[in-house]
Amino acid sequence: MSVFLFPNRIKDTDFSVTRQVIALLDQHGIHALLADELAGELVDTKAVFLPQQQALAQAKQVITIGGDGTLLRIAHDCLAQSKPVLGVNLGRIGFLATCEVEELPEKLARLAAGRYTIEPRNLLRADAPAHNWHQVAMNDVVLFGNSRLHPMDYTVYCDGAFVSRYRSDGVIIATPTGSTAYSLSAGGPVLDACAAVMVLTPVFAHSIHAVPLVFSASRTLTVVAEATNRDSVYASADSHSRCDLQPGESLTITTAVEQLGLITFDETEQFRAIETKLMRR
C-alpha cells in the first residue's frame, strides 16, 4: 500500500513531522510517496519521490501535514483522483486536519489496519455565467465588495424565489464543513458536518434583521450584485480562485455532485474539535 504525503514547508519547517510520518508508515509496510521536488530535502528517508500527479495516482490515501489550509490546497487534486484525505494538524485550529502530532502512532496504526471510516463531505459549486467561471469549494464561496469604503447590495434567490436583500460588506455561502471557518467568524451557526445543508451568512450587514439562513443542499441559490452598487464585487472559492462581478451580475451556488472523503477514526471527531478548539478558547 502507498500513501501520498503533502507537507506544508512553512508549518513543518525542518520536515521533522514528515520524517516521523514516513518512519511510522514504513513500520507498517506502507510506502510514503512525495512530490519529487522534495527529494533533496528528504533524501535520507525511505520515501519514494515521483511527479505529484503520478504519486497521487499511485496512492491509496493522502496525508496532509500542516493545517486546514494545507488540506484545502490539495483537496481539488484529491477530488479529481477520488483519494480520501487524512489531515495532520500543525496549525492553530484543525477542523479538517483532525489528527494531532501526538496521535500519529495510534492513528497511522489504525490506518494500516484498515480501522477507519471515510466520511463524505459535501462541496459547493459556484457558477458565474457572465464570465464562464466555475469552481468547486470545500469550505465556502464568498462575495465581497472590491471597495472597502462602503457596503454593497446583494439580493438572494432560492430556486428562483426572492429570499432577502442585504446591504453588507459581503455574503458567505458555506458547506457544513466550512461552517466552522469564515462563516462562524461572521456570526453563522456551526453545522453538523454530515448535514445535507448549506448556510448563507451576511458579513457586517447594515441591518438589525440580517441573520444567517440555512438551506437544503438540494436548493439552488443565486446571489445578485445589485446594479445600484458603486463598484464591482468579487467571488472566491475557498479563498483561491477569484472572479470579479460587475453591478447587475449574478453568482449561482449549488451542492456539487462530487464529495471529498475525509479519513476519520471516530464519528464524534467534529464535536470533540468544537469543544476543545472553540469552547475552550
Model-predicted regions and their roles:
Residues M1-Q61, I65, R73, E102-T117, ...:
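ATP/NTP phosphate-donor binding region
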Residues I93-D169:
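Catalytic core of DAGKc-family lipid kinases
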